């Protein structure tokens, strides 16, 4: 029983850590890319990309529901 509980906790911690690390990496990469694109003076590209991502995510969520 103790072993099972310990194993479950370890799995949860590993999953949480992995998920958090992946999210952080994605944000950092995206932010860096955004900074590079925004620096040249092209906010239109970033805005379009963000809008497209948001629309796609919204569509997926609607479809799921």
Curated annotation (Swiss-Prot):
Name any GO cellular component annotation: viral nucleocapsid
Region entry Disordered: which residue ranges?
1-65
Q: Name one GO molecular function term.
A: DNA binding
**sequence repeat boundaries on the chain:** 5-10, 19-24, 29-34
What name does the UniProt record give this protein?
DNA-binding protein
Renumbered residue ranges of the record's region 3 X 6 AA repeats of R-R-R-R-S-S: 5-34
Give the record's PTM text: Probably phosphorylated in infected cells.
Q: Which UniProt keywords apply?
A: DNA-binding, Late protein, Phosphoprotein, Repeat, Viral nucleoprotein, Virion
For this UniProt entry, what is the primary localization, expressed as one broad class? Answer: virion
Compartments it resides in: Virion
Q: What does this protein do?
A: Thought to be responsible for DNA condensation during packaging of the nucleocapsids.
Source organism per entry reads Bombyx mori nuclear polyhedrosis virus
Q: What is the lineage of its organism?
A: Viruses, Viruses incertae sedis, Naldaviricetes, Lefavirales, Baculoviridae
List cystine links. none
